[in-house]
Amino acid sequence: MLRIAVPNKGSLSGPAAEMLHEAGYQQRRESKELRIVDPENEVEFFYLRPRDIAIYVSSGRLDIGLTGRDLLIDSGANAEEILPLGFARSTFRFAGKPGTAKGIEDLAGLTVATSYEGIVAKHLADSGIDASVVHLDGAVETAIELGVAEVIADVVETGTSLRNAGLEVFGEPIMKSEAVVIRRVGAGTDEAAESKVQQFLRRLQGVLVARTYVMMDYDCRAEHLEKAVALTPGLESPTISPLHNEGWVAVRAMVPAKEAQRIMDDLYALGARAILTTAIHACRL
């Protein structure tokens, strides 16, 4: 049975559970549940603190886990990213009072407060900057106001918390993060377990594709087909079928959801009709 770690709270928890549900896996009904078994899919889910997941996975006790890229790197655990999931995107930045610094070179001799000591210390060392790092668990924005540090380093999603604290980001981003699937470095030697892991990854990849694309169908005159296909090439090739009316064909292809309205406009201008899109709920490519 595959053993998988899932975030039990925070910004990763809800979207992770939603993605797993879309992939056909049972999820907990009560937030207090720490473990559930999905017997039909032969998977056991463990709901853990997001910051601890990389440690559990690297120990080999759990096969794979869903966590943040920033948390994986900060942990220093013997685990690696195997699939980005496209949600909980954020940027890790330095911030301070206006005028404190313009770039990382201005941090020499200063103190940086952060909840991600591993990431920050390595970034400073790699940049040749001699600065002190103070570890705080959450709400690092107050560190400057209380005189604990001159600068903070934190995850920035909207920047609202920083602005409310009178702080501004500066310099280049330290890193960009998102939710990822991780596993222990060197895992994958057991063929039976590897088969289950790959099936799990295919399901999640199917969800990602289903969220990104829609299926588009339309009717088109045969003489305009090449131009129409150029607008809707599909992932490999569109499906084309002759219609009862001579000189007309039906076309079906997957198109990026974000571009669907523009493509429909272009097809209509080309003379295509009966243009419609259908949501994709699951797929395997």
Swiss-Prot record:
UniProt pathway annotation: Amino-acid biosynthesis; L-histidine biosynthesis; L-histidine from 5-phospho-alpha-D-ribose 1-diphosphate: step 1/9
A single GO molecular-function term is: ATP binding
Q: A GO term (biological process) for this protein?
A: L-histidine biosynthetic process
Q: Which residues cross the membrane?
A: none
Q: Which UniProt keywords apply?
A: Amino-acid biosynthesis, ATP-binding, Cytoplasm, Glycosyltransferase, Histidine biosynthesis, Magnesium, Metal-binding, Nucleotide-binding, Transferase
- Subcellular location per the Swiss-Prot or TrEMBL entry: Cytoplasm
Q: How is its activity regulated?
A: Feedback inhibited by histidine.
Asked if the keyword Zinc-finger belongs to this entry, the reply reads: no
Q: What is its EC number?
A: 2.4.2.17
Mind naming one GO cellular-component term on file for this protein?
Answer: cytoplasm
Pfam families named among the record's database cross-references: HisG, HisG_C
Q: Does the keyword ATP-binding apply?
A: yes
Cofactor names from the entry are: Mg(2+)
CDD domains, per this entry? PBP2_HisGL1
Catalytic activity of the protein: 1-(5-phospho-beta-D-ribosyl)-ATP + diphosphate = 5-phospho-alpha-D-ribose 1-diphosphate + ATP
Q: Its domain of life?
A: Bacteria
Q: Which SUPFAM superfamilies match?
A: GlnB-like, Periplasmic binding protein-like II
Q: What does this protein do?
A: Catalyzes the condensation of ATP and 5-phosphoribose 1-diphosphate to form N'-(5'-phosphoribosyl)-ATP (PR-ATP). Has a crucial role in the pathway because the rate of histidine biosynthesis seems to be controlled primarily by regulation of HisG enzymatic activity.
HAMAP family attached to this UniProt entry: HisG_Long
The UniProt similarity line reads:
Belongs to the ATP phosphoribosyltransferase family. Long subfamily.
Q: What is this protein called?
A: ATP phosphoribosyltransferase
